[in-house]
Amino acid sequence: MLRRRVDRLGRFALQAAYGCQGEAPPCPVVFASRYGEVSRSVDLLDNLARATPLSPTSFSLSVHNAIGALYSIARGDTTAYSAVAAGEETVEAAFVEGCALLSDGAPEVMVVVYDEPLPRPFEHFPAQVKMPHAWACRLRAADGESGYSLTCDAAAGAPDGAGAQGLPEALSVLRFLVQGDERYEHRVGPRLWRWQRHA
């Protein structure tokens, strides 16, 4: 059922979520995407403009939390699920949401990050998302000896607008998490997000 309902981006996100979840017990999940499955919305708008009928399935899957809802339904999981979109700061917003859930008592939180380039007619906007991607990780409160911190401060200087080695922001954060770098910084407008590894 899921395979027929979801588009490519949804399959990417669900594959990342299932791979990260594995056999672990259910936990709250934060789904994070700058644009979500915006191609569905564009198709619906095209159908409206041509006065052709809208697909109820496409309509129900065009909302930003649809992928998370499908994941929850398929797993029969009633834990807390949320969907966040915060432009260039989507990954940071997802981790802030995840930390809030940990602070509220959740032992673990899974974060699923996914996006793809904008479809026509939006391709003229700056390409913040250059390639389809999805990844997931599980968060838990640090034991005091090792872990990560994420802070946001006023940024000095001009924003750089590019992730590590020209990667999209979401993949720059993933690179930081898996490569063992000590620090990663992301400037957005007047804000500077600092990701720090504590050994």
Each PLM stretch: what is its role?
Residues 14-17, 85-109:
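Active-site-proximal alpha-helical scaffold in enzymes
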